Amino acid sequence: MRLYRDRAVVLRQHKLGEADRIVTLLTRDHGLVRAVAKGVRRTRSKFGARLEPFAHIDAQLHPGRNLDIVTQVVSIDAFATDIVSDYGRYTCACAMLETAERLAGEERAPAPALHGLTVSALRAVADGRRSRDLLLDAYLLRAMGIAGWAPALTECARCATPGPHRAFHVGAGGSVCPHCRPAGSTTPPPGVLDLMSALHDGDWEFAEQTPQSHRNYVSGLVAAHLQWHLERQLKTLPLVERTYHIDRTIADQRATLIGQDMDCG
């Protein structure tokens, strides 16, 4: 089969044999790709350093039966240097990469929107000018939107009645009107769902003026909504929470949201 080229974000890697690695890539045109990078653990490897997690690369690959083979790599953006130098940035970016892999869908299914979103998010994390918790929640909301899992924020998740609505129920799919509100719904403080909408839509001027208490509440809702659809928590999110010193009450609140009953139709 012919060689192919694609832009990719390196999501993760692990050792193979004495000198090789298997890398997991989120490519623009071929989606999730797993490939062998031969000899990259040797000190004289031509492109070993370019295949570290967080790297944005242009790669040439040879299709294989189970795993492709990396034959050439050109660095586009070296985000890793700025990301790994700060633990908070590192844990935030790790959560983004884990989310990207979980939401990419079937291997080799084109994922241009998720690829572009992930590149932009890593660039913003590496830049360090915006709040990491806002960046992460914005990424999670938009990534879920690409996957078709975005929570309803401006209308009722059940009957589509225009909002704003005060109640939120993860199992129902987001905000719910008084008539559709299931048992176990939470009622976020005023402004919380507005912040979620701002993060989803990219209204950073509004988002950056919100109090930390609202941001903490949004983090709980976003993580709960993502966990509901993935059916398990991201391994990296607890590390991010410790970095931001999320209050114990927020963690308890999140557990309550996850425990909402499923009889919401």
Curated annotation (Swiss-Prot):
Pfam families in the record: RecO_C (PF02565), RecO_N (PF11967)
GO biological process: DNA recombination; double-strand break repair
Key words, A-Z: DNA damage, DNA recombination, DNA repair
SUPFAM superfamilies registered for this protein in UniProt: ArfGap/RecO-like zinc finger, Nucleic acid-binding proteins
Gene3D superfamilies: Nucleic acid-binding proteins (2.40.50.140), Recombination protein O, C-terminal domain (1.20.1440.120)
One GO location term (cellular component): bacterial nucleoid
Superkingdom per UniProt: Bacteria
InterPro entries reported for this sequence: ARFGAP/RecO (IPR037278), DNA_rep/recomb_RecO_N (IPR022572), NA-bd_OB-fold (IPR012340), RecO (IPR003717), RecO_C (IPR042242)
Function: Involved in DNA repair and RecF pathway recombination.
Family statement drawn from the similarity comment of this UniProt entry: Belongs to the RecO family.
Record's protein name: DNA repair protein RecO
Lineage, opening ranks: Bacteria, Bacillati, Actinomycetota, Actinomycetes, Mycobacteriales
